[in-house]
């Protein structure tokens, strides 16, 4: 967060645009909130999360994945889709959705889950039931590489 204010404050450009990717959804929301709260004249442009052909969220970190680790990393998006499908079939309890996602991720050896969270898509507040748009966010270490991914449900 300090980086964007350090860049903006000394320059004071007349029009300042900044692109932040939706892949790190939490960071994007926090930066948008900071820009609003501090009344910076900055337009934040959300960069769409782009997936590679195999479903892995595009990231420079993917270059560190061996072919074996890349195969394992596919479970992140599969697990997000599983959570979304369960939601679309009527499940609204966050605890059940998270358990299904974790179980799916744990089915692949060599994937160390750091977190699986489902939060309000606008505020990132903790929720017990999904009643409006929410973000499913996951982070895991595959091999030596930390990967993050997310998907929005309820839109």
Per-range role (PLM):
Residues 1-4, 17, 24-109, 113-114, ...:
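Glycine-rich, Lys/Arg-enriched anion-binding loops that position phosphate/diphosphate groups
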Residues 100-155:
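Phosphate/ribose-recognition catalytic cores of enzymes acting on nucleotide-derived substrates
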């Amino acid at each position: 967060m300090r980086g964007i204010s350090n860049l903006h404050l000394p320059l004071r450009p007349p029009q300042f645009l900044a692109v932040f990717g939706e892949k790190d959804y939490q960071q994007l929301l926090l930066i948008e909130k900071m820009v609003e709260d501090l009344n910076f004249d900055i337009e934040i442009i959300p960069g769409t999360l782009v997936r590679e052909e195999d479903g892995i969220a595009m990231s420079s970190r993917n270059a560190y994945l061996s072919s074996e680790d890349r195969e394992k990393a596919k479970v992140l998006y599969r697990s997000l889709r599983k959570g979304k499908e369960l939601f679309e079939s009527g499940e609204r309890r966050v605890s059940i959705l998270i358990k299904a996602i974790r179980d799916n991720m744990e089915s692949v050896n060599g994937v160390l889950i750091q977190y699986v969270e489902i939060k309000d898509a606008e505020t990132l507040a903790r929720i017990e039931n999904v009643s409006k748009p929410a973000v499913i966010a996951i982070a895991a270490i595959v091999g030596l590489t930390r990967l993050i991914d997310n998907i929005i449900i309820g839109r």
